[in-house]
């Protein structure tokens, strides 16, 4: 869409594409927004538009030149037109591209000028009245970027970005509940609310749902799932796995099937409108495909942006960085508060081709700081000491330079001749940035004491996992983790309160995801996606209750509706057993009478969903494990088993079991590959008091875990 800056003088010229995309121009100026190009091989990147003013096109070809981006424009009159291109030099030696207008290639090579976003002159070109083509041609495949093109008959360059804020609202969507952010927490919030019958608008700036768990970023979904909805929507593959695209498709199908959800993908929120009482009236967003502003109106809102943007625009209290040790009595906090956060990652991979593959980025090699690699894992992380929001683009670019440089160095070795760089996201996988404040600020002691909150709505078991850039002297993009995960004590299951998922000063705002109310250290455990997705489920259920009861988010707590909320969520909570398990008799690996032979190891499972706090894993020559089954009266029972979710469960993993009761011995297997943390029926058996279940690791295949079993009267 082409839009004149002076809307009072604008006249409608022509429809330029399907989807109601329009061209509007004046005699003196024509603006070509980046989102109006047919992108070819360029990627539209909106993740920094709140800082630099607009989305932009990125030639992210991993060293292979991308296909041209093109736009058709109507020139209102014949004459000489000056061409201005908004761009920046992101690094010396790469990121160059050319622009053609009306079939003429401009003499300027763009992307080699100033390091700041600016309007670079492409000179003047003679154009005839009518339709002409604007074309962007990538020169190297290394992240050249263009945030718009302006044709003008004036000698002065444009000012600022081609911002959506200059556009009028073209559409209004009305709902009961607006969720901004389509990662796992936001998607869970939307689906949970919709399934309770309220109208939901889900606003997501990418073409798919999942956020960090999507195939665009490829972070595995760690942490305790707890709720069936989280299990429906979570990722099912590990870091960097291309099969995460299957999970993208599953999420999109689940949301599309919910008739109460109006899903808007490729739509980036950029501001809010407020009521006189300070509550949010609407969220304004840019439809990136049709280049028009959409207003989303509702009574209730959920900030699931990760960066806390909705709360920030609405004036919600927030903080960013590390609190001082004295503020919350946190042993892992620094003596003095500072601006440090957890960093962001770009996990990247290469594959081995069947022929040599060229790759050379000598300009990036100094930025690798001596590191050579053909893959990058979670600890390729940067930004701990920088502003994760204001400097987001610089943080991402630093990680790109490290990746290209380390891979270029590795390619000099003969054994890597056939390696091809096949994945390096351009979207940052963030861990922490702005955190919105609620009535309870979740902190370290809530984890370590396992505080039994009466208003608990989520649980976690991932230890406090803090990252530091001290992996190797002189290398600033590799990190280590310290805290309570794999580095000291683990605390088992801990609880997160409802008071941490609504704003303390914006009365109609929930928050789900990493921007929930917590300290830096307090975020260290719950920050993994499955746990944060639980917050989304709770926010969605609470939003539906607000509409049903005429309450505000705070009112659900203040007016004693927490038990109702917990009942709708399901499961156990501190002091409240799970009513669905009233007739179950559970035996855990930590229960009295359970015996493990030699070779078994007790281990905390910080990815969650174990029955107790730990599970047992056998070595290669482990002896059997024996569970006495809690059978009080002879009869027909269903035997249930629960296997914690783990990346160790591969297809074909089978655990051989022997069930002994009343002199009979029955053998069966447990499919450990279906390790999703849910209770699964293993079969129905005639059982009598004294029955035992024996796990035989020596006869088993692949991954084996011993956790919890239950006997349930048949037919229940």
Predicted regions and their residues:
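Conserved N-terminal/central alpha/beta ligand/cofactor-binding core
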Residues: 192, 198-199, 204-273, 319, ...
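Bacterial N-terminal signal peptides
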Residues: 10-23
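N-terminal Rossmann-fold NAD(P) dinucleotide-binding loop
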Residues: 186
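Beta1/beta-strand and adjacent pyrophosphate-binding region of the FAD-binding site
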Residues: 172-183
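Extracytoplasmic
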Residues: 28-168, 581-716
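N-terminal secretory signal peptides that target proteins for export/translocation
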Residues: 1-7
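Flavin (FAD/FMN)-binding glycine-rich loop and adjacent Rossmann-like elements that form
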Residues: 168-169, 212, 271, 280-282, ...
């Amino acid at each position: 869409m082409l839009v004149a800056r002076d809307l009072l003088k604008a006249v409608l010229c022509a429809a330029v594409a399907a989807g109601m995309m329009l061209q509007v121009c004046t005699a003196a100026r024509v603006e070509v927004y980046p989102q109006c190009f047919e992108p070819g091989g360029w990627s539209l990147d909106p993740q920094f538009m709140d800082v630099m003013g607009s989305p932009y096109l990125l030639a992210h070809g991993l060293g292979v030149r991308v296909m041209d981006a093109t736009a058709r424009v109507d020139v209102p009159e014949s004459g000489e037109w000056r061409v201005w291109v908004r761009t920046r030099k992101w690094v010396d030696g790469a990121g160059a591209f050319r622009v053609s207008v009306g079939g003429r290639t401009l003499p300027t090579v763009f992307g080699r000028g100033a390091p700041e976003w600016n309007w670079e002159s492409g000179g003047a070109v003679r154009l005839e009245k009518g339709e002409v083509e604007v074309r962007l041609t990538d020169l190297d495949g290394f992240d050249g970027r263009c945030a718009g093109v302006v044709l003008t008959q004036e000698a002065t360059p444009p000012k600022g970005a081609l911002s959506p804020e200059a556009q009028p609202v073209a559409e209004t969507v009305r709902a009961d509940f607006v969720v901004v952010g389509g990662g796992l927490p936001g998607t869970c919030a939307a689906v949970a609310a919709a399934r309770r019958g309220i109208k939901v608008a889900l606003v997501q700036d990418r073409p798919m749902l999942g956020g960090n768990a999507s195939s665009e970023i490829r972070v595995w979904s760690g942490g305790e799932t707890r709720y069936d909805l989280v299990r429906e929507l979570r990722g099912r593959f590990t870091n960097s796995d291309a099969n995460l695209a299957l999970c993208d498709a599953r999420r999109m199908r689940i949301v599309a099937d919910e008739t109460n959800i109006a899903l808007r993908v490729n739509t980036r929120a950029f501001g809010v409108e407020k009521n006189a009482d300070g509550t949010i009236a609407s969220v304004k967003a840019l439809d990136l495909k049709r280049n028009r502003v959409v207003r989303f109106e509702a009574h209730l809102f959920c900030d699931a942006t990760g960066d806390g943007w909705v709360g920030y625009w609405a004036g919600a209290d927030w903080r960013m960085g590390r609190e001082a040790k004295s503020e919350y009595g946190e042993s892992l906090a620094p003596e003095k508060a500072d601006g440090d956060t957890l960093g962001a990652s770009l996990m990247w991979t290469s594959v081995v081709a069947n022929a040599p593959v060229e790759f050379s980025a000598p300009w990036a090699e100094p930025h690798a700081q001596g590191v050579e690699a053909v893959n990058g894992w979670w600890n390729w992380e940067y930004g701990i000491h920088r502003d994760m929001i204001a400097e987001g683009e610089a943080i991402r670019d630093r990680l790109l330079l490290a990746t290209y440089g380390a891979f270029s160095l590795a390619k000099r070795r003969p054994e890597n001749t056939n390696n091809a760089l096949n994945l390096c996201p351009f979207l940052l996988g963030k861990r922490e940035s702005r955190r919105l404040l609620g009535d309870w600020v979740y902190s370290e002691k809530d984890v370590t004491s396992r505080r039994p909150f009466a208003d608990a709505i989520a649980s976690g078991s991932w230890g406090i996992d803090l990252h530091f850039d001290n992996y190797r002297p002189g290398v600033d993009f590799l990190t280590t983790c310290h805290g309570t995960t794999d580095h000291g004590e683990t605390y088992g299951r801990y609880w997160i309160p409802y008071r941490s998922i609504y704003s303390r000063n914006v009365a109609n705002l929930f928050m789900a995801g990493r921007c929930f109310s917590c300290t830096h250290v307090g975020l260290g455990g719950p920050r993994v996606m499955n746990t944060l997705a639980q917050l989304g489920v709770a926010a969605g259920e609470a939003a539906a209750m607000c509409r049903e009861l005429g309450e505000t988010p705070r009112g659900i707590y203040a007016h004693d509706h927490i038990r109702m909320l917990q009942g709708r969520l399901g499961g156990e909570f501190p002091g409240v057993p799970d009513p669905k398990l009233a007739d179950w008799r559970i035996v855990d690996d930590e229960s009295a009478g359970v015996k493990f032979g030699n070779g078994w190891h007790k281990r905390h499972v910080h990815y969650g969903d174990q029955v107790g706090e730990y599970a047992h894993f056998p070595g290669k020559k482990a002896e059997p494990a024996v569970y006495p089954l809690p059978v009080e009266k002879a009869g027909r029972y269903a035997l249930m088993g629960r296997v914690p979710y783990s990346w160790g469960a591969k297809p074909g993993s089978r655990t051989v079991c022997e069930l002994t009761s009343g002199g009979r011995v029955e053998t069966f297997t447990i499919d450990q590959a279906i390790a999703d943390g849910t209770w699964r029926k293993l079969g129905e058996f005639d059982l009598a008091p004294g029955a035992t279940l024996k796990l035989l690791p020596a006869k088993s295949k692949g991954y084996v875990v011993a956790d919890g079993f239950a006997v349930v009267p048949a037919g229940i």
